[in-house]
């Protein structure tokens, strides 16, 4: 789980854009950067090298 107050102040380290928390995958997602940053024991790992690339939306 991620502290709600922390989520309010964090931004994507690459774009400066908004992040949202995906509780199912325990990741902070930056749609603008196309990356998902892992959260380990409530601590976000905000390193681009550690982030997972998001799959393109194929709607």
From Swiss-Prot:
Gene Ontology CC: cytosol
InterPro entries, per the entry: Trm112-like
Signal peptide, first to last residue: none
Pfam family, any one: Trm112p
PANTHER family tied to this protein: PROTEIN PREY, MITOCHONDRIAL, ZGC:162634
Similarity comment: family membership: Belongs to the UPF0434 family.
Protein's UniProt name: UPF0434 protein AM070
